[in-house]
Swiss-Prot record:
Pfam families: Phage_capsid_4 (PF25209). The keyword Transmembrane does not apply. Assembles to form an icosahedral capsid. GO terms for cellular component: viral capsid. It comes from the Viruses. This is Major capsid protein. It comes from Staphylococcus phage phiMR11. Keywords: Capsid protein, Late protein, Virion. It is found in: Virion.
Length: 274
């Protein structure tokens, strides 16, 4: 049995591990790193948010010569979203800490980080998948991407991100040919982490959370992540069993803030494989 004085290096210290968990989380994010984070509600009472959300004003219309161009109303609607709490708990015995292979304490932290990262990412993806703008197109083709971009009806392109299955991303890269820009050539001014490259002004991010044939094209500001409370870490000691439990939680909600800034791409029956 190890002898000597117990030092801080042998213990689980929340103040040290909390920032470490945050670092583990940020490395794994794909969708959540794209969301705009709002922390203004931290410390405020209540668990249900009533928030404004922009409503898409409709596609452009054909106007005959000499006729007035109709004006559409840009509306906001009130929506509600209930704050969610996600949590993770692990427990480890003194025997495991003292005699376990590898680094059980470090693995606890890693597992907490991965668990939170996946849940937050999934919730942001769920919000994006609720996009009101949709298009049936083959996203493995450059003209399929162009069809999605056209849904924005922009005169001047704004920064946008294409979230796409890795297999589809490879096919799109091949079809884009000289219209594809490698990630190493994009510089530091990228609006999202994990860029694979760029085509037609869209930063391409690969993710296995989307099935082949399905993709999301979104502009910054499409989705928001409201934080009620960020990571909170607690340690509970059970002397009777000589175990130390680690608990972490986070309170937040992800929602589609601007419907006009997200397009869901699916490969419908009208899209032919070439």
């Amino acid at each position: 049995m190890p002898q000597g004085i117990t030092k801080t290096s042998n213990q689980i210290i929340p103040e040290v591990l909390a920032p470490m968990m945050q670092a583990q989380l940020e490395k794994k994010l794909r969708f959540a790193s794209f969301a705009e984070v709002d922390s203004t509600l931290q410390g405020q009472p209540g668990d249900t948010l009533t928030f404004p959300a922009f409503v898409y004003s409709g596609d452009a219309q054909v106007v005959a010569e000499g006729e007035k161009i109709p004006t559409d109303i840009l509306e906001t609607k009130k929506r509600e979203a209930k704050i969610r709490k996600i949590a993770k708990g692990t427990s480890i015995t003194d025997e495991a800490l003292l005699s376990g292979y590898g680094d059980p304490q470090g693995e606890q932290v890693r597992q907490h980080g991965l668990a939170h990262a996946n849940k937050v990412d999934n919730d942001v993806l769920e919000a994006l998948m609720g996009a009101k703008l949709t298009v049936n197109a083959d996203i493995t083709k450059l003209n399929g991407l162009q069809s999605a971009i056209d849904k924005f009806n922009d005169e001047d392109l704004e920064p946008m991100v294409l979230f796409i299955n890795p297999l589809d991303a490879g096919k799109l890269r091949g079809d884009a040919s000289t219209n594809f820009t490698r990630a190493t050539e994009l510089g530091d001014d990228i609006i999202v982490k994990g860029a694979f490259g760029e085509a037609l002004g869209a930063i391409i991010v690969r993710t296995n959370k989307l099935e082949a044939g399905t993709a999301i094209l979104a502009k910054k500001g499409a989705v928001k992540l409201i934080l009620k409370r960020d990571f909170f870490l607690e340690v509970a000691r059970d002397a009777s069993t000589k175990t130390t439990a680690l608990y972490s939680d986070k309170h937040y909600v992800a929602y589609l803030y601007d419907e006009s800034k997200a397009v869901k791409i699916t490969k419908g029956s009208g899209s032919l494989e070439m």
